[in-house]
Design a protein with these regions (language model features):
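Short, glycine/charged-enriched secondary-structure capping and boundary segments
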Residues: 1, 66-70, 96-99
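Short beta-strand/loop motif that positions the catalytic acidic residue
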Residues: 46-48, 53-55, 59
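Hydrolase active-site cap/lid region
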Residues: 1-26
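Short alpha-helix in the alpha/beta-hydrolase fold that links the catalytic acid
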Residues: 49, 63-73
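Catalytic histidine neighborhood in serine/cysteine hydrolases
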Residues: 74-92
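Active-site nucleophile elbow and catalytic-triad environment of alpha/beta-hydrolase enzymes
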Residues: 21-44, 49
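Catalytic active-site module of serine/aspartate enzymes centered on a nucleophile-bearing elbow/loop
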Residues: 87, 91-120
Length: 120
């Protein structure tokens, strides 16, 4: 009720402590699609295009098992799953961005290599 009345809800990011605002449209979208029409599983199973999943093995925000589950649902002919060891959700990049690091550089390299192989 409060979300609707205010038109937004504030959620604290547990990692950064940043206060994030979600407009009531997010709630309306969730309600409108509660029948699973916005199913990640269904979308991934129906995707017949190249898909690259890059996941930090120490991700506390989205555990690696969720990335593995997406990979398991995917068409293996088109999908690659890259695990970045000892790395969290942001690949050890902080906000605001100041500089890169070896782990993030590896993510960029793997992404570029994937795009070059699949689209050039």
């Amino acid at each position: 009720a409060e979300w609707r009345e205010k038109g937004l809800i504030e959620v604290v990011n547990s990692r950064t402590k940043q206060v994030l605002q979600m407009n009531v449209e997010v709630l309306e979208d969730i309600e409108k699609n509660k029948n699973n029409s916005l199913s990640i599983k269904k979308a991934v199973k129906n995707l017949n295009k190249p898909l690259l999943i890059i996941h930090g093995t120490e991700d506390l925000t989205v555990p690696i098992v969720e990335g593995e589950q997406i990979y398991n649902w995917s068409n293996k002919e088109f999908t690659e799953f890259e695990r970045i060891p000892a790395c969290g959700h942001t690949f050890d990049i902080v906000h605001p961005f100041k500089k890169s690091n070896k782990k993030f550089d590896l993510v960029i390299k793997k992404t570029r290599d994937f795009l070059d192989r699949k689209f050039l």
